[in-house]
Amino acid sequence: MEIRKAYFHLPGLFEFYELYRVFLPLYRTHRDWFYDWCEIGSLYGAPADCLWGGGRTGCSRHTAREVLALAQEYGISARLTFSNSLLREEHLTDPKCNALCAQFAQGSVQNGVIVHSDLLVDYLQTHYPELYLVSSTTKVLTEFAQLETETARPEFRYVVPDFRLNKAFAQLDSLPQPQKDKLEFLCNECCWFGCTDRRRCYENVSRRNLGELCPEHRCTAPGAAEGYRFSKAMRNPGFIGVEDIRSTYLPRGFSQFKIEGRGLGSALVLEFLLYYLTKPEHQLQVREEIYLDNMLDLF
């Protein structure tokens, strides 16, 4: 019997290049330190000042050539996060974003684009058919009927649902296997489960990437002032943990899982890599290889 594997889509293709430059050699050399039921499906992100960018504001000192070379060296798909929801026709000719797509379209491993705007979907299909497309969670598809329609769209290889549908198994189980294969669940969202401002939050990022002057979105959710905490995310009703994946999602025919974190610090992203990919008995060894030595002072 074939064992179904989980594929993790990891944040910070550009933003956490330095972390992955150290982590990926460990993942290859010491594969026995990591769960054998999972693989790295992709790295996703975007450089700073991308007109088509969305979700989070990108930042990076590294070029597309550098990040692509790293991903290709390890046979990992690279995804551009171009999920701006407010694009207009005149934005489609942006030289920087087109140059990035042209570079990503040439990879030996097929690369992709995470997208929100249908205008951009049509443009990418016409001009860069080599790239696969991922429907972004920034669409905030909270109704199952919306999600079902989205997974039926042939232009998308994957669809990231709103995290509040993560546990809607009575409905998710009704999907045929080809649509189940498209679902890419956001595992570690810390956003308040009852949030009604999520779409406005994403639109604010889209406006800023377009260069529009607008006040920064201020989250008013309970506990927002403390920011992202992984322990808090684990208490979220939509959280998907390691045991959930192994015991619930994989047996049900779901295999794609997204880890958020582009706007966080690299230390926290490393904790995600340790929790989701690394066997508990080897997590300390990974820390020691990456940063932990006998002279490190925290205080």
Residue ranges and their predicted role:
Residues 1-150, 155-299:
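Active-site pocket-lining/capping segments in soluble small-molecule metabolic enzymes
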